[in-house]
Swiss-Prot record:
Name of this chain's protein: Glutamate decarboxylase
Domain of life of the native organism: Bacteria
Cross-referenced NCBIfam families: Glu-decarb-GAD (TIGR01788)
Function (record text): Catalyzes the pyridoxal-dependent decarboxylation of glutamate to produce 4-aminobutanoate. Has weak activity with aspartate, but cannot complement an E.coli panD deletion mutant.
Cofactor(s) demanded: pyridoxal 5'-phosphate
Keyword Ligase applies: no
The organism's taxonomic lineage, starting at the top: Bacteria, Pseudomonadati, Pseudomonadota, Gammaproteobacteria, Vibrionales
Enzyme Commission number: 4.1.1.15
The species this protein was found in: Aliivibrio fischeri (strain ATCC 700601 / ES114)
Annotated GO MF terms: glutamate decarboxylase activity; pyridoxal phosphate binding
Gene that encodes it: gadA
């Protein structure tokens, strides 16, 4: 009987991916392979490996957007090869960025929204640092004119996200972070004023504190700074870290005065990929007016074909996220943003009431007075057979990722779990989550933990 060898080309075209030669061995992981691989095979290996990631829609720890419309996917694909920094080559992408800047300036009540300055960034952390840099430069210029030293700048804030710690270290600024004490978990006017001096470059309230999700009292702090100036002459500006609240308060709490309606507010940063509803990779910083951004911070570059002003901590980046942000502004308008976020707030309040009914949890934040989220701790004196780190790990077996963490210094004794309610998290999903939490509680009642997990062992920690 004659033997017939397969045609190699036919073999490559017709063989099932998983019976192919490429997938008969493990592909290299830490060294670049010597030979090429079929694109279908390389894709399938990576696709299958990514299944090991968590389901982003069940990630209730992250602030970042995990659901976008099909049109956003299309626009992102159309912009995959556009470098937004090259404004001469892609002038219309630059125009869309400019429109977003002025829309946000208007949304945040800039007195000169048509002419003020602002820019997109990779996220709210970069935007926050740019706002902080502008504060430092303005303070330094003021001190030089007064003939005073400029070597000991400080900045005052409440419990902040790690980007501000990075900013303070990288730019050699003393960070006067107001610690949590007792039941006070955010900044207060009194705590701010006792830390102010002539070297304070600015006060940075957070509109949506990472740890508790509350809004800090921007207007009350502003009024306290007004009084301080009357009494001492110290004129201290404010930057608002509105990473979350900047895309929430204007739509769901429009009467709250936190933005450029307050004269001391010189700049605001926000995250487009959080409650701005855009895909990952876009933030915004807007200045009150052009005079609030020192001209020395702006670079003009011409090596991409045209002269372009730029203020950023990076350079090349994709334009798709900016285009997607503009799409959301057109697609949703103020009414659409309000409807989406109000639905999230309503679900957060509902979750709070349902989780409280379980009986062993103390609700720390119920979705009112901050961002659409909720958090809880174990009631004092209750021993349910688990701690919150154990619960975070157990609920993960059902796919849910819920942050569990101890509070910052002076309240490390308080451990909480936090849920972010984002666009795409429905009331039905909330019911499924509550049912799974009940099953976890019942499991621990039958199988109590004698030695509970700690924060390092738990997989449910996230402040991003």
């Amino acid at each position: 009987m004659p033997l017939h060898s397969k045609n190699a080309v036919r073999d490559d075209l017709l063989d099932d991916i998983y019976s192919s030669a490429d997938l008969s061995l493990s592909m290299p992981k830490y060294k670049m392979p010597e030979q090429e691989h079929d694109p279908r095979h390389a894709y399938q290996v990576i696709h299958d490996e990514l299944m090991m990631d968590g389901n982003s829609r069940q990630n209730l720890a992250t602030f970042c957007q995990t659901w976008v419309e099909d049109e956003v996917h299309k626009l992102m694909d159309e912009c995959i090869d556009k470098n937004m920094i090259d404004k001469d080559e892609y002038p219309q992408t630059a125009e869309l960025e400019s429109r977003c800047v002025h829309m946000l300036a208007d949304l945040w009540n800039s007195p000169d929204a048509e002419n003020t300055l602002g820019c997109s960034t990779t996220g709210s952390s970069e935007a926050a640092m740019l706002g902080g840099m502008a504060l430092k430069w303005a303070w330094r210029e003021k001190m030089k004119k007064l003939g005073k030293p400029t070597d000991k700048p400080n900045m005052i804030c409440g419990p902040v996200q790690v980007c501000w710690h990075k900013f303070a270290r990288y730019w050699d600024i003393e960070l006067r972070e107001i610690p949590m004490e007792g039941d006070r978990l955010i900044m207060t006017p009194e705590e701010v004023i006792k830390r102010c001096d002539e070297n304070t470059i600015g006060v940075v309230p957070t509109l949506g504190v990472t740890f508790t999700c509350q809004y800090e009292p921007v207007k009350a702090v502003h009024e306290a700074l007004d009084k301080l100036q009357e009494e001492t002459g110290l004129d201290i500006p404010m930057h608002i870290d509105a990473a979350s609240g900047g895309f929430l308060a204007p739509f769901c709490d429009p009467d709250l005065e936190w933005d450029f309606r307050l004269p001391r507010v010189k700049s605001i940063n926000a995250s487009g990929h959080k409650f701005g509803l855009s895909p990952l990779g876009v933030g915004w910083v807007i200045w009150r007016d052009a005079s609030a951004l020192h001209e020395d911070l702006i670079f003009n570059v011409n090596y991409l074909g045209g002269n372009m002003p730029t203020f950023a901590l990076n350079f090349s980046r994709p334009g798709g996220q900016i285009v997607a942000q503009y799409y959301n502004f057109l697609r949703l308008g103020k009414e659409g943003y309000r409807k989406i976020h109000q639905a999230c707030y309503d679900t957060a309040v509902y979750l709070s009431s349902e989780i409280e009914k379980l009986g062993m949890f103390e609700i720390i934040y119920d979705g009112k007075g901050g961002i659409p989220a909720m958090s809880w701790s174990l009631k004092e004196g209750v021993d349910p057979g688990f701690n919150l780190f154990d619960l975070s790990d157990r609920i993960r077996s059902r796919g849910w990722q819920i942050a569990a963490y101890a509070m910052p210094p002076k309240r490390e004794d308080l451990v909480i779990m936090r849920i972010l309610v984002r666009h795409g998290f429905s009331r039905d999903q909330a019911d499924l989550l509550v049912a799974d939490l009940k099953h976890c509680v019942e499991f621990f009642a039958k199988h109590p933990i004698s030695h509970g997990s700690d924060e390092l062992e738990s997989s449910g920690f996230n402040h991003g």
